[in-house]
Every structure is written in structure tokens, then in C-alpha cells.
UniProtKB/Swiss-Prot annotation:
Its cofactor is Mg(2+). This is Ketol-acid reductoisomerase (NADP(+)). It catalyses: (2R)-2,3-dihydroxy-3-methylbutanoate + NADP(+) = (2S)-2-acetolactate + NADPH + H(+); (2R,3R)-2,3-dihydroxy-3-methylpentanoate + NADP(+) = (S)-2-ethyl-2-hydroxy-3-oxobutanoate + NADPH + H(+). It comes from Streptomyces griseus subsp. griseus (strain JCM 4626 / CBS 651.72 / NBRC 13350 / KCC S-0626 / ISP 5235). Keywords: Amino-acid biosynthesis, Branched-chain amino acid biosynthesis, Magnesium, Metal-binding, NADP, Oxidoreductase.
Length: 333
């Protein structure tokens, strides 16, 4: 079973005695920086000149400097910029400012796991990753609660990396809910697999296939949309609240019977075999290598896939139907 840590297992004074730089001010960056500050931590935010986030961070009372200045000042550096540019930010702004005894923190392990960033031997390399979006992390902190976090130590130069990571997690409210110890390898590989095979890739492909099956059989796109996409939220919310058991308790017996007898016909042994191939490609670095190459080549295939899905009948139908739903916020991303 997983090893769990709570408030009494973490010493907030450890992170309060350090100087923290948060590089990036997106969803997680703002939650980390503001919550650490409110926990009595010396925080600065590192943003490039011209960043649209600078004014927002300053309005919220944070000191903003360049990433290089932030890294030079701090002895705990949390990198929360997007995965594909982390290595560039590290090379340009962090690498030459690291000193023995410093700590390099991440919210996701991809760049360490696959060697895009190779820290020097004298620094701690840790992860603190809340299992929720930044706005929830911040709101829970302000309400005196917290979002569960995972922590990991890839390189423990000081011999006190775990204590530091737990202290950081306490500073953003994580230990109020509970913190699970993991490794960079486990976090990275399971996170990527979950996104690709289930949460994003698997779910999107399942929804599209169901929608296409109904419309190709002559059913109205609007009805197919409701049955294959819109109502998915109702089911996922029940699973989120109480697992498969609560979902099945809440649906009709007809739906539950269909779940048992039809689900295994959709997700077959062949599907699971393909999932294992996906996992292997994550583990051996194939996915990370291909994704970084795609990103740094200007995202041609990425944009092609994005455009194709945007033009899909599922999406055009959904955009019109959501206009009927006053409770749905369908602002353009």
C-alpha cells in the first residue's frame, strides 16, 4: 500500500527557512506561489520579460523577476512551465545558478524521467504534484483544507529531500488532505498512460466511435451527442464521488445489466493488449521523444489532428446544442 503523510508528518519551518522561486504562473504556478506566501514562505515568481502573467502576479502581491534572477536568489526552484519548454528554461535560466545544497522541484516528472534535464549531483531533485487543478488547490488552501499531493525524491543530495518535499507540500495545503510518496518514474509513466489510454485519448476515441456508430446508422446527430457525450458527465461524476459502486447503484438496472454484458465486448483483450503497447512506448521513451520532436518542429501533426477534431460532426453538433444549455460555459478556449 502507498505511504501516506499528513500535517503532523511535515515540518513547515523547513520550507519557511528557504528561498523559493516558482517559475511559471499558470494553473499550478499561481496556486503554489500564493499558498506558499500565505504559509510564511519567502517566494518570488520567475517570468520572462513580456509575460502576460506578470501583471496578474504583481496585482496579487507577489514579487516578479526574470527566471534567471529568481533562480539566482532562491535555493528551492520549482519549475512549473509547460513540459516541452522546461529543458530550455533550465538551460537558459536555472543550470548556471544552481549551487550545491539547492533543490530543484517539479510538478511532473517527464523531463527528469526521460533525461531532458540532467541536474548536477549536488542538488536535491524533488516533486510535489497536487492531484487537482491549480484553482482547486488554491481554493481548498484558502478554505483551510487541501488537495491530496504526491511527492517524490529522485536525487537526495542533502539526505533530507523527503523532509523538504513534505514541508513544501504542507505549504500549499497538501498534507491537510494527505500526501502519497511515489517516484519520478512511477508518476511520469502512470500519468502519461492515464492521459493517453483512459482520460483523454481513450475517452475521446470511445465517445467519437459511439457517436459515429449512431449517426452512420441514421440516428440524429443531436440525439447521438446527448447519449454518447453529454451524459458522460453524469456517469463520471458518480464514479468520482463513489467509484464504480456508486455509479452502478445510481443508474437503472437496465443500464447496469448493459454495463456488465456489453462493456467487455467494447474493451476487449485486444484493447488491453494495445494498452500494454502504449505503456511500453511510454516506458522506453518513444512517446516522450516523439512528442518533443513534434513540439520543436512546430506542431504540424498536432495542429492537423486538432483541426480535424474541431471540424468533426460531434463538435459542430455540440457547439449548437450547448447554446440551449444556460448552465454550460462554452467560452472559446
Amino acid at each position: 500500500m502507498a505511504e501516506l503523510f499528513y500535517d503532523d508528518d511535515a515540518d513547515l519551518s523547513i520550507i519557511q527557512g528557504r528561498k523559493v522561486a516558482v517559475l511559471g504562473y499558470g494553473s499550478q504556478g499561481h496556486a503554489h506561489a500564493l499558498s506558499l506566501r500565505d504559509s510564511g514562505v519567502d517566494v518570488r515568481v520567475g517570468l520572462h520579460e513580456g509575460s502576460k502573467s506578470k501583471a496578474k502576479a504583481e496585482e496579487q502581491g507577489l514579487r516578479v523577476v526574470t527566471p534567471s534572477e529568481a533562480a539566482a536568489e532562491a535555493d528551492v526552484i520549482m519549475i512549473l512551465v509547460p513540459d516541452p519548454i522546461q529543458a530550455q528554461v533550465y538551460e537558459e535560466s536555472v543550470k548556471d545558478n544552481l549551487k550545491d545544497g539547492d533543490a530543484l522541484f517539479f510538478g511532473h516528472g517527464l523531463n527528469i524521467r526521460f533525461g531532458f534535464i540532467k541536474p548536477p549531483a549536488g542538488v536535491d531533485v524533488c516533486m510535489v504534484a497536487p492531484k487537482g487543478p491549480g484553482h482547486l488547490v488554491r481554493r481548498q488552501y484558502e478554505e483551510g483544507r487541501g488537495v491530496p499531493c504526491i511527492v517524490a525524491v529522485e536525487q537526495d543530495a542533502s539526505g533530507k529531500g523527503l523532509e523538504l518535499a513534505l514541508s513544501y507540500a504542507k505549504g500549499i495545503g497538501g498534507t491537510r488532505a494527505g500526501v502519497i510518496k511515489t517516484t519520478f518514474t512511477e508518476e511520469t509513466e502512470t500519468d502519461l498512460f492515464g492521459e493517453q489510454a483512459v482520460l483523454c485519448g481513450g475517452t475521446a476515441a470511445l465517445v467519437k466511435a459511439g457517436f459515429e456508430t449512431l449517426t452512420e446508422a441514421g440516428y440524429q446527430p443531436e440525439i447521438a451527442y446527448f447519449e454518447c457525450l453529454h451524459e458522460l458527465k453524469l456517469i463520471v461524476d458518480l464514479m468520482y464521488e463513489g467509484g464504480l459502486e456508486k455509479m452502478r447503484w445510481s443508474i437503472s438496472e437496465t443500464a447496469e445489466w448493459g454495463d456488465y454484458v456489453t462493456g467487455p465486448r467494447i474493451i476487449t483483450d485486444a484493447t488491453k493488449a494495445e494498452m500494454k503497447k502504449v505503456l511500453a512506448e511510454i516506458q522506453d521513451g518513444t512517446f516522450a521523444k516523439n512528442w518533443m520532436a513534434e513540439y520543436h518542429n512546430g506542431l504540424p501533426k498536432y495542429n492537423e489532428y486538432k483541426k480535424a477534431d474541431s471540424d468533426h460532426l460531434l463538435e459542430t453538433t455540440g457547439r449548437e446544442l450547448r447554446k440551449l444549455m444556460s448552465w454550460v460555459n462554452d467560452e472559446e478556449a
